[in-house]
């Protein structure tokens, strides 16, 4: 069932071409960080373009629980009056992070070096996800964690009373783990160092520098080395959140596979640590162009124009690209199903521990709808059937995963018999306007229980 009530089945069917402009929401990663860094600054941070999905709203509630003043103004601007690094107060109640792995892991890092106790929980999906990957490095600071077996929520963290800086090499590429360690390092004296063998999204580093933290990055034989000097006074900022490339992926890919389509998706953040999907689509032969490239708030931005692309070919996606598109593999597999030939995706074991086991969820759903898929522990292969080659006709289990839900709805627009998902409710966690936005482009969506 949906995280917020009864299941909401929905069916996507083949209709006409998708045309027009898709104004997708603000970037989820930057929205979370804007609230958290604003709460750790001294003074008022103002944010426009914040994603108002449930995940981010849960983070806003957590910042209030930690003592920051967080308010949405009538014009949509968000105001955060921060309490300073180390200034968080102990919440009166359990922090419910809903479906947000990003939210809970960043919040754990943010409080880990302040001597308070915080209990975290979430929905059924979040409670099944591993948290030891975050609590293990936080323990190096002196943070203590008490929770269920295998490091799962609900979990109580007790912040370190006398935190020490750490040097930590991330065992798997994870921007969430890296960011949690950097956030903890803010309130530890001296230099905290994070080493990552593969570069992951660098919004935390860019934004911390913007808030006045002393942070540097260099590439060495060990990998990418990020050094943060602890106990700064963060300076409040005015932030314009760029549009989310992970949300843009859905109208872009839907246009590419739906006959006659031509869709413009403006103001999309194209941080190189996030743009792997768009590079991959172009490698496959998609008609995808970047218009009006520019820089806003330290982030590269462009308008994306996506058109129906009937001549796409399957490719082997470079494994080193995985970190820059880890959330986009589900929708890429839908595009691959509508390309000619075989698409191979390797080095993606992280997909097994997302909101759902995304490899299993996508493989099962694609097979039900007539696509041949092979999969293993950290790889999967989609055998494409060409434009409009997906039979459809099946109902797919979304496993409370917003990206699985949206991926199969996009698949339905180009399928022969339509595709039904068992629950559209989770879409609200990251893309609350998905349904009206796609309808405005001409998509055919039916609420199965309407």
Swiss-Prot record:
EC number: 2.5.1.19
Catalyzed reaction equations: 3-phosphoshikimate + phosphoenolpyruvate = 5-O-(1-carboxyvinyl)-3-phosphoshikimate + phosphate
Protein name per its UniProtKB record: 3-phosphoshikimate 1-carboxyvinyltransferase
Binding site for 3-phosphoshikimate: 28-29, 33, 174, 176, 327, 354
Protein family (similarity comment): Belongs to the EPSP synthase family.
Domain of life of the organism encoding this protein: Bacteria
Main location: cytoplasm
Role description: Catalyzes the transfer of the enolpyruvyl moiety of phosphoenolpyruvate (PEP) to the 5-hydroxyl of shikimate-3-phosphate (S3P) to produce enolpyruvyl shikimate-3-phosphate and inorganic phosphate.
GO cellular component, one term: cytoplasm
Binding annotation for phosphoenolpyruvate: 28, 101, 129, 176, 358, 403
Segments for region (Disordered): 1-25
Cell compartment(s), UniProt: Cytoplasm
Natural source organism: Jannaschia sp. (strain CCS1)
GO molecular function annotations of the record: 3-phosphoshikimate 1-carboxyvinyltransferase activity
Record-linked Pfam families: EPSP_synthase
């Amino acid at each position: 069932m949906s995280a917020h009530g009864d299941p909401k089945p929905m069916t996507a069917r083949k209709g006409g071409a998708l045309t027009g402009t898709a104004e997708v929401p603000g970037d989820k990663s930057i929205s979370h960080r804007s609230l958290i860094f604003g709460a750790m600054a001294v003074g008022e941070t103002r944010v426009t373009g914040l994603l108002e999905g449930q995940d981010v709203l849960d983070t806003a509630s957590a910042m209030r629980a930690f003592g920051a003043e967080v308010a949405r103004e009538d014009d949509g601007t968000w105001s955060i009056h921060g309490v300073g690094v180390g200034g968080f107060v102990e919440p009166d109640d359990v922090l419910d992070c809903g479906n947000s792995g990003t939210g809970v892991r960043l919040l754990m890092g943010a409080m880990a070096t302040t001597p308070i106790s915080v209990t975290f929980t979430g929905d059924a999906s979040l409670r099944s996800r591993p948290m030891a990957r975050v609590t293990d490095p936080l323990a190096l600071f002196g943070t203590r964690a008490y929770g269920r077996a295998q490091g799962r929520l609900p979990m109580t963290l007790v912040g370190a009373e006398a935190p020490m800086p750490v040097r930590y090499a991330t065992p798997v590429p994870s921007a969430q783990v890296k960011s949690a360690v950097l956030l903890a390092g803010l309130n530890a004296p001296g230099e905290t160092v994070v080493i990552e063998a593969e570069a992951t999204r660098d919004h935390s580093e860019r934004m911390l520098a913007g808030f006045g933290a002393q942070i540097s990055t260099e590439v060495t034989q060990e990998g990418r080395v990020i050094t943060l000097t602890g106990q700064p006074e963060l300076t409040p900022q005015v932030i314009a959140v760029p549009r989310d490339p992970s949300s843009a992926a859905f109208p872009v890919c839907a246009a590419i596979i739906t006959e006659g389509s031509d869709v413009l998706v403006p103001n999309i953040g194209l941080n190189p640590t996030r743009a792997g999907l768009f590079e991959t689509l172009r490698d496959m032969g998609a008609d995808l162009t970047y218009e009006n490239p520019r820089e806003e708030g330290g982030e590269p931005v462009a308008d994306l124009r996506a058109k129906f692309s009937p001549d796409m070919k399957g490719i082997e996606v470079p494994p080193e690209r995985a970190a820059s598109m880890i959330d986009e593999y589900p929708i890429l597999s839908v595009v691959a199903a509508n390309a000619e030939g075989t698409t191979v995706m390797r080095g993606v074991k992280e997909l097994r521990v997302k909101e759902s086991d995304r490899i299993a969820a996508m493989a099962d759903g694609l097979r039900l709808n007539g696509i041949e898929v092979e999969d293993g522990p950290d790889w999967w292969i989609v055998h494409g059937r060409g434009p409009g080659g997906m039979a459809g006709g099946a109902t797919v289990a979304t496993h409370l995963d917003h990206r699985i839900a949206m991926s199969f709805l996009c698949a339905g627009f180009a399928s022969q018999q339509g595709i039904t998902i068992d629950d559209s409710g989770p879409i609200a966690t990251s893309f609350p306007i998905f349904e009206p936005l796609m309808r405005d482009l001409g998509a055919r969506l039916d609420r199965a229980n309407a």
